[in-house]
Structure formats: structure tokens, C-alpha cells
Amino acid sequence: MTTHRNDTLSTEASDFLLNCFVRSPSWQHWLSLPLSLLFLLAVGANTTLLMTIWLEASLHQPLYYLLSLLSLLDIVLCLTVIPKVLTIFWFDLRPISFPACFLQMYIMNCFLAMESCTFMVMAYDRYVAICHPLRYPSIITDHFVVKAAMFILTRNVLMTLPIPILSAQLRYCGRNVIENCICANMSVSRLSCDDVTINHLYQFAGGWTLLGSDLILIFLSYTFILRAVLRLKAEGAVAKALSTCGSHFMLILFFSTILLVFVLTHVAKKKVSPDVPVLLNVLHHVIPAALNPIIYGVRTQEIKQGMQRLLKKGC
């Protein structure tokens, strides 16, 4: 593995150079293997979960359709970000073309927003299941899932589209070294010799509007869920509901917290090492993806039974 660091324009003008850890280049050494393992775990586990849901007829239910959508989003996010990061860590292959960079930027923003929206819909599903169990079959239907999926797709595709468009219209005046492992909007626009105020305002306003509204609805859903669970008389039912919903909420909280810390470190970039938000940005694209199949899948009895039935059929 090489650690060659050359911040001159060593590529053609049509390329950016991804320069991951400017202050701490040794981080590449100890991150390369764990990140590779996390990537394999995330892609493998989500693919397994996705295939289980679609091959096992008993799992053809609204909640599991949403879970399969979450797995698909995780797979796309991992494949969009982590392979390029690993080629930098292992082989120091830092160039990325302008079109590839802006495409990666769009997919990252769009699919992270879709994942946040999917968490919100799944939280609503749990709210209806626990707070209005008798009405659940009439509210959470296949038709509801189709409408929810269309909303997730339309809202986030349209809202995140201006981000790469605004970045692609900037002039970069010969500067092409991105101090990041990925084509994050803030890192790319920092290279421009144009005024990037509109870019940054849209990034923050759009991000807080999408993720903020999702988080508020998620928090409200789990607040009502907690209140309903605490009213249950059966101790076993209370423990089971708290265990399931608690793990779901902790994962969503982790997903949101690491994103919030990433934003705050960008705001306070003079007080923290510039490598910290770079590291958080990379981890944010793989750790939740590795945890989602465990929290939402393996710990769910119906999915475990579905996997066992598929294994028996295969044998």
C-alpha cells in the first residue's frame, strides 16, 4: 500500500484528486482492513436480507417491503462510496473524473435523504402497529407502501438534484485536489473560485428541511409508541416492545447523530482537525448499512424463520 502525497495537479483538468487524510495520512493504514470488512458485511448482509424477503412468501408484507427498500438503499450507498475509498486506501488511486464525482455527489445526497425518509415511514408503521393495532391492516396496506415509496423517491430525487447541478456550474480555476475521500458538496465547492454562497445555503437549508422534518416525525412516532407501550399490562409484551422499538430508535439516533456531528465539525472546522469530518463522512456510509440488517432483520423472529425455511429448501 502506498501513501504517496502529491497535491500538485498531477492529472488532467478533467479529473479531481481525492486526498483523504491530509493531517493524518497514517489513518489509511489502520482503517483499510476494518473498512473492507465492514463493506463486505454491509453488502453481504443487506443482499441476504433482500433476497430472503423477496423469496419467502410469508414475508411479503408492508413492513418487510419497507425493510427491503432500506436494504436496497444501503447497498447502493455502499457501492457508490466505499469501493472508491478502498482503492485510495489500498492502491492510492486518487483521481476521479468530473462526471463521476458529480454523479457520486448526487447519489450520496439523494440516497441518504431517501434512507432518512424510509426510517420515518417505518417509524410510522410501528406507531400504527402498536398504538392502533386493530386498524393496522386497513392503514398499512400494499397500496400504502407503493404511495410511500413514490413519495420517498419523488421528494428526494427532486430536492437533491440541484446540489450536483450547482456544483457542476462552478469554475475551479485549475484547483482539483479535494481534501476528502468522497465528492462531498462542501469539499468540492471549496475548490471553486466562484461565489459558493448559494451552494452552501441550499445544502444546509435542504438538508435541515429533509432530515429535520423526518427526525421530528420519527421522534413523535416513538414518543407515542413509548407512551402506548408503558400502558401495556403484560410484562413480557412491554419488554418485547421496548427491546424492538428501542433498538430501532437507537439505530436511527446513531444515523442522525453521526450526520449532525459531521455538519458541526464542518461549521467548526478551525477548532477540529479537517480529517475528523472526512472520517465521519466515510463511516456514515458503511456503519448504519452494516447495522440495519442486524437490528431490523436478524433480530426479527419472522425473518429468522424465513431464512431457516429457505435454507431447508436449498438443502
Swiss-Prot record:
<dbReference type="InterPro" id="IPR050402">
    <property type="entry name" value="OR51/52/56-like"/>
</dbReference>
<feature type="glycosylation site" description="N-linked (GlcNAc...) asparagine">
    <location>
        <position position="185"/>
    </location>
</feature>
<dbReference type="InterPro" id="IPR000276">
    <property type="entry name" value="GPCR_Rhodpsn"/>
</dbReference>
<feature type="topological domain" description="Extracellular">
    <location>
        <begin position="1"/>
        <end position="29"/>
    </location>
</feature>
<dbReference type="InterPro" id="IPR017452">
    <property type="entry name" value="GPCR_Rhodpsn_7TM"/>
</dbReference>
<dbReference type="GO" id="GO:0004930">
    <property type="term" value="F:G protein-coupled receptor activity"/>
</dbReference>
<feature type="transmembrane region" description="Helical; Name=2">
    <location>
        <begin position="59"/>
        <end position="79"/>
    </location>
</feature>
<dbReference type="InterPro" id="IPR000725">
    <property type="entry name" value="Olfact_rcpt"/>
</dbReference>
<feature type="transmembrane region" description="Helical; Name=3">
    <location>
        <begin position="104"/>
        <end position="124"/>
    </location>
</feature>
<feature type="topological domain" description="Cytoplasmic">
    <location>
        <begin position="222"/>
        <end position="241"/>
    </location>
</feature>
<keyword id="KW-0297">G-protein coupled receptor</keyword>
<keyword id="KW-0675">Receptor</keyword>
<keyword id="KW-0552">Olfaction</keyword>
<feature type="topological domain" description="Cytoplasmic">
    <location>
        <begin position="125"/>
        <end position="143"/>
    </location>
</feature>
<keyword id="KW-0325">Glycoprotein</keyword>
<feature type="transmembrane region" description="Helical; Name=5">
    <location>
        <begin position="201"/>
        <end position="221"/>
    </location>
</feature>
<keyword id="KW-0472">Membrane</keyword>
<dbReference type="Pfam" id="PF13853">
    <property type="entry name" value="7tm_4"/>
</dbReference>
<dbReference type="GO" id="GO:0004984">
    <property type="term" value="F:olfactory receptor activity"/>
</dbReference>
<feature type="topological domain" description="Extracellular">
    <location>
        <begin position="165"/>
        <end position="200"/>
    </location>
</feature>
<keyword id="KW-0812">Transmembrane</keyword>
<feature type="glycosylation site" description="N-linked (GlcNAc...) asparagine">
    <location>
        <position position="6"/>
    </location>
</feature>
<keyword id="KW-1015">Disulfide bond</keyword>
<feature type="disulfide bond">
    <location>
        <begin position="101"/>
        <end position="193"/>
    </location>
</feature>
<feature type="topological domain" description="Extracellular">
    <location>
        <begin position="80"/>
        <end position="103"/>
    </location>
</feature>
<protein>
    <recommendedName>
        <fullName>Olfactory receptor 56A3</fullName>
    </recommendedName>
</protein>
<keyword id="KW-0807">Transducer</keyword>
<feature type="transmembrane region" description="Helical; Name=7">
    <location>
        <begin position="278"/>
        <end position="298"/>
    </location>
</feature>
<keyword id="KW-1133">Transmembrane helix</keyword>
<comment type="function">
    <text>Odorant receptor.</text>
</comment>
<keyword id="KW-0716">Sensory transduction</keyword>
<comment type="similarity">
    <text>Belongs to the G-protein coupled receptor 1 family.</text>
</comment>
<feature type="topological domain" description="Cytoplasmic">
    <location>
        <begin position="299"/>
        <end position="315"/>
    </location>
</feature>
<dbReference type="GO" id="GO:0005886">
    <property type="term" value="C:plasma membrane"/>
</dbReference>
<feature type="transmembrane region" description="Helical; Name=1">
    <location>
        <begin position="30"/>
        <end position="50"/>
    </location>
</feature>
<feature type="topological domain" description="Cytoplasmic">
    <location>
        <begin position="51"/>
        <end position="58"/>
    </location>
</feature>
<feature type="topological domain" description="Extracellular">
    <location>
        <begin position="263"/>
        <end position="277"/>
    </location>
</feature>
<keyword id="KW-1003">Cell membrane</keyword>
<feature type="transmembrane region" description="Helical; Name=4">
    <location>
        <begin position="144"/>
        <end position="164"/>
    </location>
</feature>
<feature type="transmembrane region" description="Helical; Name=6">
    <location>
        <begin position="242"/>
        <end position="262"/>
    </location>
</feature>
